[in-house]
A protein has these predicted regions:
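Gram-negative and organellar
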Residues: 2-388
Length: 388
């Protein structure tokens, strides 16, 4: 049965270069390795997952360079009929809100499960293993035909003291095929036991048929605090609220007209009242297989009155498959910015990408250029990957 073990993975190398006439150049290379060994052992219930990257900064003077590496995942897991166990650097199963160097246990029935995890929390700045940061949590999850939901309580520590404690919940609901709702919520608990709403996302989409859809949403984001590991635990609360309404309409099975309006309000103690509100409008049209040429085209325009500034932007992007393995993409944009009483600033950008996609090999080359009033930025991004 050991012969049934399966190994999959990806090896990739990415090279990024940007040259800016105002701030100089930047050059970096990133290598990444991802491995997934599944159906291991005589029971075929063991697996090993590994994901790591190494970044080499080549922007230094006199050919000097700096390295930055990190391991995102390195875990050994057992997946039984009802019991799941994992050890290593991991994201808790069905509740990937914290990464830990530790253990995770999850017991589940046909629809509902309960899990617990505990371990060392990687250093948030370097992602290295350290005993200074810790994390533990207890969570529940449910996956039904119409409802999926989860709830968790998380404790983060720093050198033996409480760094952060918070509640987290998420859910999706499809009461009828044409209606879909989603949301998640985070509430932080202070050392004194007070509970404050930190983040809230709620969205409702109504799609009565294959032609049109309407979406309404609300977001709230508040700065949360680390009470032990930073010097800024007494920073004033700041909050940002956003409401948005979007709609799409399909024409002749080829074209889609869409629009979105969004308003935001900031509650920042240090910000003047005239800089607290934002209103944005965006509209566009996209088309598939234009004139039977295989070309996809998207045109959009947006107008934003944002915190004492105004933005107008017009953009396009188009793509076409060249045979079965190549895809060509071209894009461009023009933006006009007005900051208060100052004169307007214009920015023009354009670029293109070429993708090669095969069973095991994927390669891409991307070029773009951005032109402002007093600067020019050019970027080149190349990437090659091999699928095992």
């Amino acid at each position: 049965a050991a012969d049934a073990a399966q190994l999959n993975g990806t090896v990739s190398l990415e090279d990024y270069y940007s040259g800016d006439t105002a701030s100089g150049s930047r050059h970096a290379m990133t290598g990444r390795l991802r491995l997934d060994l599944t159906k291991a052992g005589s029971s075929e219930k063991f697996a090993f997952h590994f994901d790591a990257r190494q970044r080499l900064d080549l922007s230094g003077e006199s050919s000097t360079s700096s390295k930055e590496g990190r391991i995102d995942q390195a875990q050994l897991e057992y997946a039984g009929t009802s019991l799941y166990l994992s050890i290593g650097r991991l994201w808790p199963k069905d509740m990937p809100i914290e990464v830990v160097d530790g253990v995770n246990a999850f017991y589940h029935g046909p629809k509902t499960g309960v899990g617990v995890y505990a371990g060392l929390r990687p250093n948030p700045y370097s992602q290295s293993t350290t005993a200074d940061f810790t994390s533990a949590g207890l969570y529940l999850s449910h996956a039904g035909e119409k409802l999926t939901a989860g709830a968790a309580f998380v404790h983060n520590g720093y050198k033996g003291d409480t760094d952060r404690q918070y509640f987290y919940g998420y859910g999706t609901w499809t009461p009828i095929p044409s209606l879909f709702a989603l949301g998640n919520i985070t509430a932080d608990m202070s050392p004194s036991g007070e509970i404050d709403l930190t983040n809230l996302i709620a969205e409702l989409t109504w799609r009565p048929d294959e032609v049109k859809s309407f979406t309404f949403g609300y977001n709230q984001f508040r700065a949360f605090k680390y009470y032990a590991s930073t010097l800024f635990a007494d920073i004033n609360d700041s909050r940002q609220d956003a409401w948005y309404l979007g709609a799409t309409y399909r024409l002749a099975q080829k074209y889609t007209v869409y629009g979105r309006v969004e308003t935001q309000k900031r509650h920042f103690p240090a910000v003047e009242s005239g800089q607290n509100d934002m209103l944005s409008y965006r509209a566009g049209v996209s088309g598939d297989n234009l004139f039977n040429t295989g070309v996809f085209l998207n045109l959009s325009a947006s107008i934003t009155d944002s915190y004492d500034s105004e933005y107008k932007s017009y953009s396009f992007d188009m793509s076409r498959m060249l045979g079965e393995s190549f895809q060509l993409m071209v894009n461009g944009a023009y933006t006009e910015n007005v900051y208060g009483a100052a004169s307007s600033a214009e920015v023009t950008s354009f670029g293109g990408s070429l993708f090669y996609m095969a069973r095991r090999w994927n390669m891409s080359l991307g070029l773009d250029r951005e032109q402002g009033a007093d600067y020019t930025t050019s970027r080149i991004l190349t990437r090659v990957s091999f699928n095992m």
